[in-house]
């Protein structure tokens, strides 16, 4: 009987989880007098967060409709970077599939896609990430961006997958693509400097961005294009990174 009562109590907690976390008052409590108009912190710090199902957590992380249009593009980029469920990308055989799930279902990214300055702000954010002065290395690592804001390694990996995804077409106009090529190469070099910290996955992410740029620019030979296309489609799983880097950086 005691076991049944305990089980019933646990079910009540889980069932009430989404109601408590999704409560509009909870979202409004996140608002403050600072420039930050939305944050995931108050959602994930809720005592019931760990008891929620994945769907309940994902629903809880949606930005209230009343706030979406009020957020700046920079804030939307930062929210995409700090989404608490970003690590699920690497629960998929192909991490891009996980990233696509978040991009297609998170209303913050959908709003970002509508912004004319989305590509510029995304590039500004990524360019501001310091891959050399890493904290909490070797794992889990934390990386600093502009204004010394701290992001987990998985947060930045998600941004790299966005940059490579093709979901923001304006990233691939001539001006932005040249900048994306330059910035992603610089970040790859920064990671190589800290080869005691960054492994194959992180290095592959840089090369996946570079692969997308190379495929869009039509500068590859037919044979190289096939190799790079396979590398991109497998999200880094089809070839070793030394082979890919030799092709991309000829």
Feature annotation, model-predicted:
Residues 1, 22-25:
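Generic cytosolic/nucleocytoplasmic N-terminal low-complexity/intrinsically disordered segments
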Residues 13-16:
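C-terminal motif of bacterial Sec signal peptides marking the signal peptidase cleavage site
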Residues 2-7:
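Sec-dependent signal peptide recognition
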Residues 18-20:
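Bacterial signal peptide processing site
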Residues 25-250:
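Non-catalytic all-alpha helical scaffold/repeat segments
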């Amino acid at each position: 009987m005691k076991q049944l009562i305990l089980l019933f109590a646990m079910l009540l907690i889980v069932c009430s989880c989404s109601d408590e976390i999704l409560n509009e008052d909870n979202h409004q409590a996140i608002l403050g007098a600072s420039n930050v108009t939305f944050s995931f912190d108050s959602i994930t710090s809720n005592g019931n967060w760990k008891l929620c199902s994945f769907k309940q957590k994902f629903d809880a992380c949606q930005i209230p409709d009343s706030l979406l249009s009020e957020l700046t593009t920079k804030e939307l980029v930062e929210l995409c970077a700090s989404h608490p469920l970003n690590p699920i990308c690497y629960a998929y055989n192909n991490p891009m599939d996980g990233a696509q799930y978040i991009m297609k279902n998170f209303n913050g990214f959908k709003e970002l896609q509508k912004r004319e300055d989305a590509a510029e702000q995304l590039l500004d954010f990524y360019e501001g990430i310091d891959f050399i002065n890493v904290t909490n290395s070797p794992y889990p690592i934390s990386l600093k961006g502009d204004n010394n804001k701290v992001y987990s390694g998985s947060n930045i990996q998600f941004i790299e997958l966005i940059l490579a995804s093709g979901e923001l077409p304006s990233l691939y106009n001539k001006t932005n693509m040249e900048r994306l090529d330059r910035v992603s190469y610089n970040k790859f070099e920064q990671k190589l400097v800290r080869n005691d910290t960054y492994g194959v996955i992180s290095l592959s992410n840089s090369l996946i961005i570079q692969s997308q740029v190379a495929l869009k620019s039509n500068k590859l030979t037919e044979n190289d294009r096939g190799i790079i296309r396979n590398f991109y489609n497998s999200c880094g799983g089809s070839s070793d990174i030394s082979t890919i880097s030799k092709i991309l950086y000829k």
